[in-house]
Amino acid sequence: MPTPLTVVAAIIENEHGQLLIAERPPNKAWAGYWEFPGGKIEPGESHEAALLRELREELGLNLAGETLTHYYHGNRGAEVILDFYHIRLTRDIAPQSLEGQRWRWVSRAEITDYRFPEPNAAVLQKLQNASA
């Protein structure tokens, strides 16, 4: 059985309680859907190091020094493991679209207005329950 692919994503929350989401680019699976920024773990990389690297590569964010709190762990069959980390910002940040994707800050209530890939359903439900 092949080793599952591990994907890490950041639920980045600003000082106004808004969450950062990014639109998946046209050349990727789930194109046009929205997601929490992140990506694949490289061999020998920790979850946290991979997430910080992906945030730098995709959005030009240097979040070293911010606290990453594990928020959710899920499996998509046997092929993919999803790990989400919550980052509550202690300073203003300005994401950039380094890979051409759109991004925006949304409230927890607004998040249901966006289409997310099906594997994100459980973490979205957890976010909705936390805001109720």
Ranges and model annotations:
Residues M1-L19, K40, Y71:
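Conserved N-terminal beta-strand and adjoining loop/helix that marks the start
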Residues L5, N14, Y71-A94, R102-V106, ...:
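Active-site-adjacent beta-strand/loop module that shapes the phosphate/pyrophosphate-binding cleft
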Residues Q18-E57:
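Conserved Nudix-box catalytic region and its N-terminal flanking loop in Nudix hydrolases
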Residues Q18-L19, W103, F116:
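A residue-level structural signature of the nucleotidyltransferase/glycosyltransferase Rossmann-like core
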Residues R108-P119:
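C-terminal structural segments of small proteins and small subunits
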